[in-house]
Amino acid sequence: MSSLSRELVFLILQFLDEEKFKETVHKLEQESGFFFNMKYFEDEVHNGNWDEVEKYLSGFTKVDDNRYSMKIFFEIRKQKYLEALDRHDRPKAVDILVKDLKVFSTFNEELFKEITQLLTLENFRENEQLSKYGDTKSARAIMLVELKKLIEANPLFRDKLQFPTLRTSRLRTLINQSLNWQHQLCKNPRPNPDIKTLFVDHSCRLPNDARAPSPVNNPLLGSLPKAEGFPPLGAHGPFQPTPSPVPTPLAGWMSSPSSVPHPAVSGGPIALGAPSIQAALKHPRTPPSNSAVDYPSGDSDHVSKRTRPMGISDEVSLGVNMLPMTFPGQAHGHNQTFKAPDDLPKTVARTLSQGSSPMSMDFHPIKQTLLLVGTNVGDIGLWEVGSRERLVQKTFKVWDLSKCSMPLQAALVKEPVVSVNRVIWSPDGSLFGVAYSRHIVQLYSYHGGEDMRQHLEIDAHVGGVNDIAFSTPNKQLCVTTCGDDKTIKVWDAATGVKRYTFEGHEAPVYSICPHYKENIQFIFSTALDGKIKAWLYDNMGSRVDYEAPGRWCTTMAYSADGTRLFSCGTSKDGESFIVEWNESEGAVKRTYQGFHKRSLGVVQFDTTKNRYLAAGDDFSIKFWDMDTIQLLTAIDADGGLQASPRIRFNKEGSLLAVSANDNMIKVMANSDGLRLLHTVENLSSESSKPAINSIPMVERPASVVSIPGMNGDSRNMVDVKPVITEESNDKSKVWKLTEVGEPSQCRSLRLPENMRVTKISRLIFTNSGNAILALASNAIHLLWKWQRNDRNATGKATASLPPQQWQPASGILMTNDVAETNPEEAVPCFALSKNDSYVMSASGGKISLFNMMTFKTMATFMPPPPAATFLAFHPQDNNIIAIGMDDSTIQIYNVRVDEVKSKLKGHSKRITGLAFSNVLNVLVSSGADAQLCVWNTDGWEKQKSKVLQIPQGRSTSSLSDTRVQFHQDQVHFLVVHETQLAIYETTKLECMKQWPVRESAAPITHATFSCDSQLIYTSFMDATICVFSSANLRLRCRVNPSAYLPASLSNSNVHPLVIAAHPQESNMFAVGLSDGGVHIFEPLESEGKWGVAPPPENGSASAVTATPSVGASASDQPQR
């Protein structure tokens, strides 16, 4: 917005204030973000109108803009929370804690725990730091003093706290001056003109005209009472301009049955919703010649009104009665020099020689180190980046020339050199598509390793195929293409049948971006004349016609979560633009700064982590924070990059592939990426090829994957410490199973017992790794904690030192409701929150929510029948719980609204296992009916089901439990049944490996993955504990009962009922026994591991591999 337009807003604000449109004044202040009315803010705080306070603030800043903003929102929400506690309105306080204060836990988890702890106090003033808290009125006044300091110090409020000095009724004066000037231009000026409208210019009419003007020098709209107006607080300073909305709304565009023409306006609005699949980056290429079109540069009128400076000035101290809040990286007394965040991939980890110049790259959506490359001579390559191995290299070849059109055959004869314009994987990685510069699209099916098979060849367009993307209209996987023939076409990905053709562009179509919002699916397309169009799958024409910044080569992409839309374009003059679109308002929200004045090629961009943008420009990779228009940092990758390098992130943002000179590809990595590559490299050095019937290798970076455990829990692992051991490859040595038969051959510890219980039904290590929680068959919970001391500096669980059985000073126990059920018949289940503060549990009665610090019961819900038998949190929303029931149903329950959202029916007996995959967006369930079901978490529809394969000759008890737990790759899962261990692939629900229990052997009681998914710890009815290699389900170590049970119990039928793996130490596990005891196990320090992996079958190792810091088996709240 220009400075004059900004000043006009101030004039309107003054006019509204004078006319006493009070609510409208403050609404315009908020929406424009030009003037922060401190007096109005103070009044709303004093009155406790917290919703209005936050709504008003939202026009100027957001919670995560900077530390000042974060503290402002924190103090407001904390005050609202304390007032609810002071009124003894516990439900409201809990609601504020979950909805408003939870966001701060990621910055200061200890503080959030302390705030949560206030719920357990009768009077929160018992907290030492809040002991001076007075009444509500005085507390608000004290807080307001601190808020004013924070606002005045916040750079986002700079130049917004003073209203410009204006004469009274300045807008009226300007209009009257204009009317006087108009009257002077009248050809027949009348002495007493009558001004009846401002909608058209004034002109005195002849005497025979019907209109009778009034004196022009009368005040506008007559003499009206004047308000006091805004105080003259001094001149305003400079302000960053904002994007101006375009008068071409797209409201209702989806309801129009035919093409609706719109005027082409620079930076026009794109009012569309959020997608399901992130649009991929586009490659630069040489498009056909088009006439040049002028377009505003990045420093013109497309800049956000909210700039976020990197430098932060002095901190403001907090009041004595405030809980102090500090955040990472906080500096005192000095401005900070910004440093590139550690989660950006900045280290050159791999350099790959492709052989020809890369034009397009795409990482596999699940196998995070698998990179697909297309080059300028039509080659495609498939790289395992971790091992630096090129798995596949294919040159361009038409599969069936006889089926090609004559124009294509003629084009290939005239110019046989064909370039790859785009490569892209399907959402599940089972297919990939290649778009070529000559007519052709080829689809390959991928089956792991080097197994790449021809699937479909489509003669798609006349001329080049410029882009290709996958979409799922009507839940049918399709391939969408665009080309030089100015069309967009949609093809059935299974058969190659053309479903739709979209025509309407007047220039070659450069890129496409499929997208869906709710149940409406559509496609964005951009052409080389700068036009952006949107299409529904209905052959009814374009719904949108706007112009993109740069008016030439433009691509569009969404953030990974589909909530934010970006476009990147380069003009024919080399000016490049990245902008974010405000879909709800239909305007350019912000234009990012930092491009070279004249880019030396078409700039390519990508997004990652719902936070960063990256683009290849000026022989470097440039990064932006999505919320800040200024350049975050630029990296040259040790030099040697192309002028406008092609770039591509892997799905989790831990790796970034960048094209370089001399046909090279550089792969950048952050710390997670380096660990991922290191693990893959170590594993590949042990075996070069996967075993027969092995599971394809799938890696996931450490920071995002949560592994659902056998106890219905899924833990987000960030500090797992895998032990990458050097297994012997000496073929001359004979492998021997490791047997542990004496207490001296391992480290084991029976945890001390303050009370006797009959048997342990469920067992969990806490997420922090310093405690164990057990649920006994009598519905009582037991908690052991290790203390930090000289002998245990970390305070983590260890078999070398006994923990303390912990209980609060009140002496109360966490005891589940048992209703009228027989404890022996009840099925206990529980789930632990990721911050270890709460446990949700049931033992045949109501489900209870306990505070782990005080052992108090916070809530109970869902009384039987039916009774809960398994609990699992949804990986994207901690308020959604999947609850398995004893009536064979699965209830999808929303804790916040206390409502069952869906009821899933597919089993015939009680539910015994649930596990979520946040990669495949599915829920896998298992039941006492030995059946496995896969449910889609989007609509909770059953996708597949299969009855467990019971080994031949084995009988099974009528209510035998079947447990499921996802491997760290989130694609394969472990099935545990008394007759077997099995590994299944989820998408096909196919058994990949099975280890059956011999007919004469003791049945399995429980099993779980180690935290890195490399091992499977398994307990048996005869008290034996076995350790298997998860890659091939081969036994590597056996712990006999004599190693941990005293001789007096050797013939007493005492055995493990449940087993749990430590969340960070991959060689530590614990078992819960049928006599109520809990044992923890570790290998001897001299050994460091449980046995040696058996030699690979048929001379090769299986390829289910682990990543360095992912996994778990026993906690329940994954990160959202």
UniProtKB/Swiss-Prot annotation:
UniProt name for this protein: Topless-related protein 1
Membrane spanning residue stretches: none
Compartment(s) of residence: Nucleus
Effect of deleting the gene: Partially suppresses the constitutive disease resistance phenotype of the snc1 mutant.
Composition skew (Polar residues), residue ranges: 1099-1120
GO aspect biological process, one term: regulation of DNA-templated transcription
Gene3D superfamilies (alphabetical): YVTN repeat-like/Quinoprotein amine dehydrogenase
Domain CTLH: 34-92
Cellular-component GO terms for this entry: nucleus
Remarks, miscellaneous: Overexpression of TPR1 leads to constitutive activation of defense responses.
Tagged with keyword Transcription regulation: yes
Keywords carried by this UniProt record: Nucleus, Phosphoprotein, Repeat, Repressor, Transcription, Transcription regulation, WD repeat
Residues annotated with Phosphoserine modification: S214
Subunit field text: Tetramer. Interacts with SNC1 (via TIR domain) and HDA19. Interacts with SPL (via EAR motif). Interacts with SPEAR3/TIE1. Binds to and corepresses GAF1/IDD2.
Taxonomic superkingdom: Eukaryota
Pfam families cross-referenced by the UniProt entry: LisH_TPL (PF17814), TPR1-like_2nd (PF21889), WD40 (PF00400), zf_topless (PF21359)
Domain notes: The N-terminal TOPLESS domain (TPD) (1-209) binds directly to a 12-amino acid LxLxL EAR motif peptide.
